[in-house]
């Protein structure tokens, strides 16, 4: 790297500063590129996380709905049993009256 001392002092930069900058500029560029890639992947991950969260919420809603239906089905089964008992009593009563 050819750095003219007069040009460096005219620009206000010390030759050592220019050397350090030239050595680090490649690394800084790669760091900047890595940060941009991380931001992009973070955005993709956030979108995917939102999709997964919505999917889990939908599944939880289905499970809750199914559980509430189970309670209603159990209630209907109990009512059916009670109706069967009442029908048997009624048949006994009708049978005893007709005899």
UniProtKB/Swiss-Prot annotation:
Keyword Electron transport annotated: no
Oligomer and partners: Component of the biogenesis of lysosome-related organelles complex-1 (BLOC-1).
Alphabetized UniProt keyword annotations: Coiled coil, Endosome, Transport
Lineage: Eukaryota, Fungi, Dikarya, Ascomycota, Saccharomycotina
Function: Component of the biogenesis of lysosome-related organelles complex-1 (BLOC-1), a complex involved in endosomal cargo sorting.
Gene Ontology cellular component terms for the protein in this record: endosome
Family: Belongs to the SNAPIN family.
Protein name: Biogenesis of lysosome-related organelles complex 1 subunit SNN1
Subcellular location: Endosome
Top-level taxon of origin: Eukaryota
Residues in coiled coil: 34-94
Keyword Glycosyltransferase set for record: no
Organism encoding this protein: Kluyveromyces lactis (strain ATCC 8585 / CBS 2359 / DSM 70799 / NBRC 1267 / NRRL Y-1140 / WM37) (Yeast)
Predominant location: other
């Amino acid at each position: 790297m050819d750095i003219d001392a007069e040009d460096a002092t005219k620009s206000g930069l010390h030759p050592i500063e220019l050397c350090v900058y030239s050595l680090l500029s490649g690394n800084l560029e790669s760091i900047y590129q890595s940060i941009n890639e991380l931001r992009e992947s973070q955005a993709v991950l956030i979108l995917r996380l939102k999709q997964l969260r919505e999917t889990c919420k939908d599944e939880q809603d289905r499970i809750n709905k199914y559980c509430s239906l189970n309670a209603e089905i159990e209630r209907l089964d109990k009512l059916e049993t009670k109706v069967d008992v009442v029908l048997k009593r009624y048949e006994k009563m009708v049978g005893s009256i007709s005899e």
